[in-house]
Design a protein with these regions (language model features):
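Conserved catalytic core of sirtuin-type NAD+-dependent deacylases
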Residues: 1-129
Length: 129
C-alpha cells in the first residue's frame, strides 16, 4: 500500500497533491454543498431553523398536530428538491469518484444531487438523522 504524504498546509495546492496521491479517499458532505443549488441548510443565518422552530422528538410523538406539521414541512422541502440541479461542487466530487481518487461519498443530504452529478448510487452513502 502506498504512503500518502501528510497535509501540512491548508492551501488548495496541498489538498490537490493529497488527492492526487490518494486511491482510497472518502468525501464527507453536508448541507453546505447543496446551498449553491438553492437548497437551504438548517443552521446558518437564513437557514431552515432561522425561519421555523425545530420539532423535538417528544413533541412529535405526543401531539398529532405537531406530527402533521412535521410531515407538511418535509413535503414542502421535497418540492424544493425536485427542481434542484447539481452544482460545481457536486461535479467536482463526481470527477474525483469517476477518476478513482475517491472511493465513496458519505453525505448527510438526501437530495440526490451527488447521484445526479454522476456519482454511482453504490458509491453514495446517505446518513441523515
Amino acid at each position: 500500500m502506498g504512503k500518502t504524504p501528510p497535509l501540512t498546509g491548508s492551501s488548495n495546492t496541498e489538498f490537490a497533491k493529497l488527492i492526487f496521491h490518494s486511491s482510497r479517499a472518502v468525501i464527507f458532505t453536508g448541507a453546505g454543498i447543496s446551498t449553491e443549488s438553492g437548497i437551504p441548510d438548517f443552521r446558518s443565518p437564513g437557514g431552515v431553523w432561522s425561519k421555523m422552530k425545530p420539532i423535538q422528538f417528544q413533541d412529535f410523538v405526543a401531539d398529532p398536530k405537531i406530527r402533521h406539521e412535521s410531515w407538511r414541512r418535509k413535503f414542502d422541502r421535497l418540492d424544493g428538491l425536485a427542481n434542484a440541479l447539481p452544482n460545481s461542487g457536486h461535479f467536482a466530487v463526481a470527477k474525483l469518484v469517476n477518476n478513482k481518487k475517491v472511493s465513496h461519498v458519505i453525505t448527510q443530504n438526501v437530495d440526490n444531487l451527488h447521484q445526479n452529478s454522476g456519482v454511482p448510487d453504490n458509491q453514495v452513502i446517505e446518513l441523515h438523522g
